[in-house]
């Protein structure tokens, strides 16, 4: 992998070793998932292909971002957080920050920091990846 990857993601079905290679400790672990008949996809920045997350980290595919369809993700890597701001969304007010690809600095989504609604607090610490800003990496 190129130097642009602090962490890169490898298909766990193709290698007997850990599926997440890192200079540091691995950040991802597919927990309690059967590896039979599971389609593994690595998602990256659409512009520079830096790895961001995997299909094993998707919580929901039923989200809308600024540019259209988005995924709610449990973990992402290789991003830097932008300025913290308050945003009004369909489900309430949130304290969020944009997340930028650490290599090319393009916006790929945002991180939920705090929710004003108790029933939306499960989103805190989770990430939105906008599909128009990401791609499938092979």
From Swiss-Prot:
Binding site for Zn(2+): 45, 48, 101, 104
UniProt keywords, alphabetically: Metal-binding, Zinc
Residue ranges of domain Yippee in the record: 41-138
Cellular component per GO, a single term: ubiquitin ligase complex
PROSITE patterns for the chain: YIPPEE
Gene Ontology molecular function terms on file: metal ion binding
A Pfam family this chain is assigned to: Yippee-Mis18
Disulfide bonds: none
Keyword Zinc: yes
Domain of life: Eukaryota
InterPro entries cross-referenced by the UniProt entry: Yippee (IPR034751), Yippee/Mis18/Cereblon (IPR004910), Yippee_fam (IPR039058)
Record keyword Protein transport present: no
Family affiliation: Belongs to the yippee family.
PANTHER family xrefs: PROTEIN YIPPEE-LIKE CG15309-RELATED
Protein name: Protein yippee-like MOH1
Gene expressing this chain: MOH1
């Amino acid at each position: 992998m190129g130097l642009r990857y602090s962490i890169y993601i490898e298909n766990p079905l193709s290698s007997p070793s850990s599926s997440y290679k890192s200079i540091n400790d691995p950040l991802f672990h597919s927990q309690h998932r059967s590896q039979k008949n599971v389609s593994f996809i690595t998602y990256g920045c659409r512009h520079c292909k830096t790895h961001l997350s995997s299909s094993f980290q998707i919580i929901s595919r039923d989200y809308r971002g600024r540019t259209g369809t988005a995924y709610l993700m449990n973990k992402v890597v290789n991003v830097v957080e932008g300025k913290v701001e308050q945003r009004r969304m369909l489900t309430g007010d949130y304290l969020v920050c944009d997340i930028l690809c650490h290599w090319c600095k393009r916006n790929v989504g945002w991180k939920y920091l705090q929710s004003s609604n108790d029933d939306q607090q499960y989103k805190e610490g989770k990430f939105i990846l906008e599909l128009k800003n990401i791609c499938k990496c092979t």
